[in-house]
Amino acid sequence: MVNIESKAQMLDVQPLITHYMDQLSVRQLLEKYIPKTPQMQVAPADALSMLVFNIINAPNPLYKVSEWAADYLDGIGEKPREAEKYNDDCLGRNLDRLYGCNRDELMIELAANAIHAHHLETDKIHNDS
């Protein structure tokens, strides 16, 4: 007899967010500017991407993100094993890393990716913010 396991996971707008983040190479940029070190349980790119998902989908305070993420990562009604890695301490440390990285270059590359991916007109650009 074959034992089949299944679990229901929440999707919501995650595929759409992932699509646009992939188009802009957000994860690759985060990996480039905030590299993972061996002692980190969660890569900064993963933690910061989780924050982007949360902010767009259902903004929560940092201490509630892992609870929100459980339905997406571990399955609806399941024990939050994967999601508990995205606790407020992990997210806060990675926000500090983002603050400490070369954000100017990261934003310039992100803007260039958006211009390229969406064929935006660049006759006039105001780079004042």
Model regions: which residues?
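Dynamic "connector" segments at or just before major functional cores
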Residues: 1-129
